[in-house]
């Protein structure tokens, strides 16, 4: 994004403070454009005026260019399942944040029998993992043409498309690619891949069907040349594949090419290579060894490039030892460091508690909250859980930083009216907040019990300490 201050954006806006965008002032709207929560197209008066006045239209186009991300954003698929890739602004997450999580696509191929194809598609579509308040899912399918038969490939693509997930069409033969596009072009699949040998045919297909296309070349000069050619021909949605090699010097070379592409695009301001990057961890299946070894290296490759600039990936393995670590890593890398993951503060009733059941307190840091809530629920423990607003910080950090205090605990007790729900005045605090025991007792008038350091030990702790002895 070329603009750095809200005032620069403000000068392009109507400056009427009409509020149609949902913000009180145009300056506030300008600030939210900078943090990417809205776009200039959300300014309705500006868009309406641009349709009538060529000068305003030019002004809007200039603003869109100025506020465009450093790396082009490409959309794969349509509707609510569409996957956005690219759109990044910085080389390092701590400089701002990373915006669009890496797209995870899993391969199927057109020589699979129908039953195996359906089973594999069902596994991908049904995968769901609950993690700190979010359900993590897989993004789509990469349909590989291994038969060389355009008719068969089209049939399989149609069947896979019926699952409603975004598609990557993996075929080097232009006839097979054309057959698939005739079937699913309206679903905006990503073409994979235009190479030195087929780029002319793929360029025609990208223009004809108006779908995004991947350019593949190990030589970065060639890759850039292809990108320039496609851009000048009118193709806007481009993905770059610098070729993923799975081991040793090959993997080192892949890493260096990816770093060079992204640094050139952002630090070097070279728009000719400022596109999302494709990584293919599936390349690990080309190495020698058993399936466990191959899938292990697939997870290793994916992990490297989730951290370093991989915007979209193609996988083979859908085993838990590959999916769980990579999808969890993706979530954590693409969590906004400016805003800790947190839950709403307040009172939670766990396992239908009664007036004589214990009252616990924890912070609203999502990882802490869901760990405690899960341990209480799975342990069959009936209790009341107070969730304190610590601005998304964990127990030890918030105690040290002043977000977890006796006065805030008192306010929470009063706001939730927990005193009306229980017959006792005992509060169980986390072991890491033990230093606050006396202060909370003085502030609230409640008797404070110091619980275990680990919420997984609450059940055993209660057996010894609840009900409390007077």
From Swiss-Prot:
The keyword Ribonucleoprotein does not apply. The keyword Methyltransferase applies. Binds 1 [4Fe-4S] cluster. Keywords: 4Fe-4S, Cobalt, Iron, Iron-sulfur, Metal-binding, Methyltransferase, Transferase. It holds the Pfam family CdhD. It is an enzyme of class 2 (transferase). It catalyses: 5,6,7,8-tetrahydrosarcinapterin + methyl-Co(III)-[corrinoid Fe-S protein] = 5-methyltetrahydrosarcinapterin + Co(I)-[corrinoid Fe-S protein] + H(+). InterPro entries: 4Fe-4S_dom, Ac-CoA_synth_d_su_TIM-brl, ACDS_complex_subunit, AcylCoA_decarb/synth_gsu, AcylCoA_decarb/synth_gsu_arc, Dihydropteroate_synth-like_sf. GO terms for biological process: acetyl-CoA catabolic process; methylation. Its cofactor is corrinoid; [4Fe-4S] cluster. [4Fe-4S] cluster binds at residues 18, 21, 26, 43. It comes from the Archaea. Residues 1-62 form the 4Fe-4S domain. Its EC number is 2.1.1.245. One of its GO terms (molecular function) is 4 iron, 4 sulfur cluster binding. Part of a complex that catalyzes the reversible cleavage of acetyl-CoA, allowing autotrophic growth from CO(2). Heterodimer of delta and gamma chains. The ACDS complex is made up of alpha, epsilon, beta, gamma and delta chains with a probable stoichiometry of (alpha(2)epsilon(2))(4)-beta(8)-(gamma(1)delta(1))(8). This is Acetyl-CoA decarbonylase/synthase complex subunit gamma. It comes from Archaeoglobus fulgidus (strain ATCC 49558 / DSM 4304 / JCM 9628 / NBRC 100126 / VC-16).
């Amino acid at each position: 994004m070329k603009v750095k201050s809200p005032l620069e954006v403000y000068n392009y806006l109507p400056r009427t403070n009409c509020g149609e965008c949902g913000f009180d002032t145009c300056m506030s709207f300008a600030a939210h454009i900078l943090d990417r929560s809205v776009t200039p197209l959300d300014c309705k008066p500006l868009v309406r005026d641009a349709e009538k006045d060529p000068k305003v239209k030019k002004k809007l186009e200039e603003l869109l260019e100025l506020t465009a991300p450093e790396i082009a954003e490409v959309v794969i698929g349509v509707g609510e399942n569409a996957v956005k890739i690219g759109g990044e602004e910085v080389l390092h997450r701590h400089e701002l944040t990373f915006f669009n999580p890496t797209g995870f696509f899993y391969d199927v191929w057109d020589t699979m029998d129908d039953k195996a194809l359906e089973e594999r598609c069902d596994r991908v579509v049904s995968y769901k993992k609950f993690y700190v308040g979010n359900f993590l899912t897989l993004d789509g399918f990469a349909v590989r043409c291994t038969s060389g038969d355009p008719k068969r490939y089209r049939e399989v693509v149609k069947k896979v498309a019926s699952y409603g997930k975004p598609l990557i069409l993996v075929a080097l033969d232009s006839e097979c690619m054309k057959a698939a596009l005739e079937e699913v072009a309206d679903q905006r699949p990503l073409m994979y891949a235009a190479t030195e040998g087929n780029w002319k045919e793929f360029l025609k297909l990208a223009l004809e069907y108006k779908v995004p296309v991947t350019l593949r070349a190990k030589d970065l000069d060639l890759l850039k040349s292809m990108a320039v050619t496609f851009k000048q021909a009118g193709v806007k949605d481009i993905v770059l594949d610098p070729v993923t090699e799975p081991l040793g010097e090959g993997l080192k070379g892949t890493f260096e090419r990816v770093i060079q592409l992204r640094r050139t695009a952002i630090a070097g301001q070279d728009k000719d290579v400022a596109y999302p990057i494709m990584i293919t961890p599936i390349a690990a299946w080309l190495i020698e060894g058993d399936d466990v070894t191959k899938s292990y290296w697939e997870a290793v490759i994916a992990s490297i490039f989730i951290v370093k600039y991989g915007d979209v990936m193609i996988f083979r393995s859908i085993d838990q030892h590959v999916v769980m670590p990579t999808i969890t890593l993706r979530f954590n890398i693409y969590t906004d460091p400016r805003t800790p993951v947190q839950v709403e503060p307040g009172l939670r009733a766990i396992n239908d508690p009664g007036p004589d059941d214990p009252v616990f307190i924890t912070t609203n840091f999502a990882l802490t909250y869901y760990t405690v809530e899960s341990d209480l629920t799975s342990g069959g423990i009936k209790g009341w859980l107070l969730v304190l607003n610590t601005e998304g910080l964990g127990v030890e950090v918030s105690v040290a930083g002043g977000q977890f205090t006796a006065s805030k605990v008192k306010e929470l007790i009063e706001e939730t009216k927990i005193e009306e729900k229980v017959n006792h005045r005992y509060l169980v605090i986390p072991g890491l907040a033990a230093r606050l025991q006396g202060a909370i007792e003085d502030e609230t008038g409640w008797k404070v019990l110091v619980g275990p350091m680990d919420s997984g030990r609450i059940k055993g702790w209660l057996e010894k300490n609840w009900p409390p002895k007077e």
